[in-house]
Curated annotation (Swiss-Prot):
InterPro entries referenced in this protein's UniProt entry, alphabetically: ABC_MlaE_roteobac, Permease_MalE
Function: Could be part of an ABC transporter complex.
Source species: Rickettsia prowazekii (strain Madrid E)
Compartments, record wording: Cell inner membrane
Annotated transmembrane regions: 13-35, 49-69, 148-168, 195-215, 237-257
Protein name: Probable ABC transporter permease protein RP096
Amino acid sequence: MLLKIAHLVGKHTIKFAQSVGIFSLFSFIAISSIIKPPLYLSLIIRQLLFIGFHSLPVVAMTTFFSGAVLALQSYTGFSRFSAENSIATVVVLSLTRELGPVLAGLIVAGRVGASIAAEIATMRVTEQVDALYTLSTDPIKYLVCPRVIAAIITMPCLVLIGDIIGVMGGYLVGIYKLDFNSTAYLTSTFQYLEPIDVISGLIKATVFGFIISIISCYSGYYSGKGAKGVGRATTSAVVNSSILILISNYLITELFFKV
């Protein structure tokens, strides 16, 4: 019994270490290929539209209602301590530091990550990736680099727009639902907001964009055979991206805001 358990643990440990090694090599090749010609500008523009513009409505709606709910919940809690004047500050700091980047990252991971993994996995199953080799085209340069570049560019833009819309959601609830004075609310919003709060959120967004794109491409590129392989690649891309987003979010927060 103990030998079986040890064998099982060792088997999964070796498999995990092998996956980490392959992923590290894949990431290194992808990063080094970004600076090499050709650039495939048309593919980058196409991915910019897909990852950024088409994700904007979902991100905007999510951050708007998150800001609105945050204002309501903050009022419910802070009113017990007569600290209602701090609601605007809590809303803007929570959105710019944490909620904006994390929510946008998880949404893009679910929407874009699944699509990227499924698309590349389907190309792998139908041997389109192998066909690129016969055309003297580097599959990683052609399939991975445009998506990584587009994700790194668009994620900070999505987060910045989402932060603004989320603050607007909190503002509208504060003014029309909680009867705050408009001028006082806006003053409280920007009184304690510092550049580092916004910058840290944008850096998180950039890291999240890289995580989503590289993991999704990796999951699709090394997918299994058949429809089952495509499904597993899609699930793996979303789950692993979401987990790494939350882990990296803590690490970046620890780096910028040490207690």
